[in-house]
Structure formats: C-alpha cells, structure tokens
A protein has these predicted regions:
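C-terminal capping alpha-helices of c-type cytochrome domains
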Residues: 9, 83-89, 96-121
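Electrostatic cytochrome c docking/interface patches
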Residues: 9-38, 121
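Short glycine/proline- and charge-enriched loop/turn segments
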Residues: 16-20, 60-67, 89
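Extracytoplasmic/secreted proteins, especially bacterial periplasmic and envelope-associated proteins
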Residues: 20, 30, 34, 38, ...
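Conserved beta-strand positions that form and line the central face of beta-propeller blades
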Residues: 24-25, 50, 67, 91-94
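Sequence/structural segment immediately N-terminal to covalent heme-attachment motifs in c-type
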Residues: 29-52, 58, 81-87
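Electron-transfer interface patches adjacent to heme c in soluble/periplasmic c-type cytochromes
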Residues: 64-79, 95-104
C-alpha cells in the first residue's frame, strides 16, 4: 500500500488594515450584473464561471485559484477581497490599474453572491 500526501497551499491573507476598507455598494441587480460581467470575463478563466477555482486555465496554476464559494473566502472581509483584487499575487494579476475602485467593489459584491448555502457571513 502506498500513502499519498497532498501539499496544502498556505491561505492567502490580506493585511489586517484591509479589513478597514468598507464596500460602498449595496447589492442590487445592476451591481450584481456589472460584477458578474467583469468576473466572467476576467476572473472566470481561472476561478471558473461559478467561482469554484476550476476555470479552464486553473490546471496549470500554482497556487491554485481560490474557490470563491468556500467558507474561507466568504468569511473574509469585503476589504480583504478588495485588497486581493487590487494587489494580486503571482499568478493572479493586480487589477489596480485595470479596473476602477467601483468596478473592483462590483466584483467583491458578485463574489458574495457565490456563497454556498449556509456559508455566508
């Protein structure tokens, strides 16, 4: 019998001060549609259209893309998610110069809509 161990990628943590960033947007159909469009076009290739980290480009990435439906992601602050989208890390690009603040908050708002039942903050 052989045993296999799977290396766990350390969780990506935003700096504590990111928690102080507050989402100025209120989720509504317009904000969610805008966030979904941005997410699908820019985040979907790696994170997947449903946010599970299983997009077509995910297989070759290290670290693997986050599952945005997971309790870990859904329990992060909005500010933490905004910071990660803004700053990026290898292999995820920074979107600081690609999207406006409002567009990044739209993506955060959309990520919240991906929560599995019972996993929302």
């Amino acid at each position: 019998m052989f045993s296999r161990s799977v290396a766990q990628t350390p969780k990506w943590m935003a700096p504590k001060e990111a928690d102080d960033l507050k989402n100025p947007l209120v989720a509504n159909s317009h904000i969610l549609a805008a966030g979904k469009a941005l997410y699908t076009a820019n985040c979907g290739p790696c994170h997947g259209d449903k946010g599970r980290g299983d997009g077509p480009a995910a297989a070759g990435l290290n670290p693997k893309p986050a599952d945005h439906t997971s309790a870990f992601v859904q329990n992060e602050s909005d500010g933490s998610l905004f910071w990660k989208i803004t700053e990026g890390r290898t292999p995820m690009p920074s979107y600081k110069k690609t999207f406006t603040d409002e567009q990044r908050w739209e993506i955060v708002t959309y990520i919240r809509s991906l929560a599995k039942p019972g996993k929302k903050k």
